[in-house]
Amino acid sequence: MSQQFGNPLMRFLRKVKARFTEREGTRGYQRRLERETRRVERTFAGELQPVLIHTYGKVGSTAIQTSINKLSGFGSFQTHFISEAGVTEARAVHQDHDRDPIHLKVGEALRRGMVEHPDKVVRVITLVRDPVARAVSNLFENPVLLLGENGGDLRKMPVEQVVEIAAEQIRSSLDYTERWFDRELSGLFGFDFFAGPFDREAGFQIREEGRLKLLSGKLELLSNNGGPFLGRFLGLAQSLEIPRRRAREATGEASLYEQVRKSLKLPAAFLDEVYQSRVCRHFYTPAEIDGFRKIWQA
């Protein structure tokens, strides 16, 4: 009797919960969207200094924003797409139940803010990372986005299959990374990002282009050199303390992630393509690239 009673009851409760959750989700989305777009407007119209942690993703930007959010006088935003072309392309990929992801709406609001307040100084922080390590991390953080709703559960796949998927993601990310710098830095702010030199030994560099103050750096040296550069970039009297990045163990996928990292071995010719890219040659020393190759080469 309890089974006959329980199944319909549980189905009914699940439907009620689904309807309630959907309404809450919609209201929560609208509240968060309004809060973030108002924050953009207040930052550009007021006394706060806008700081855009503007990256192509999975390069440690969350840790930097966490630190900046503890400071007064700044309005910080973690962004991936601000340019019109970038937002349009991302919108076609980031589908969220017929709603725009909030970070794309924020990107559009930031672009409007920069147009409406042309004299406002804008600070931009961007980071890079070993492209192979980044692609593997991105796969584990965004499997549905990369593989689709029916792409399968990475945790239930053989390690060999996940390794194959990771290799394919590396290939697809190369062009994305190059286009991102052209669109989201050079195109958006009106200068050739790669025309100026980069201090590859220090791993970070500050430059100014008109209203833009830009700090670019390497994730691999963030814990060593990032704090002093960020402090100087923000006009602080001391280094900016950066929290440790989240350990992979906290995600519940540590074992598979480490197995994939250890099992992923790529042909030398393919690594030539990866590490001879414009982005890698701009940011990394030959010794650093050799170190990456030793990790990943078959």
Where do the protein language model's features map onto the residues?
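Membrane-interface amphipathic segments in extracytoplasmic regions
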Residues: 2-298
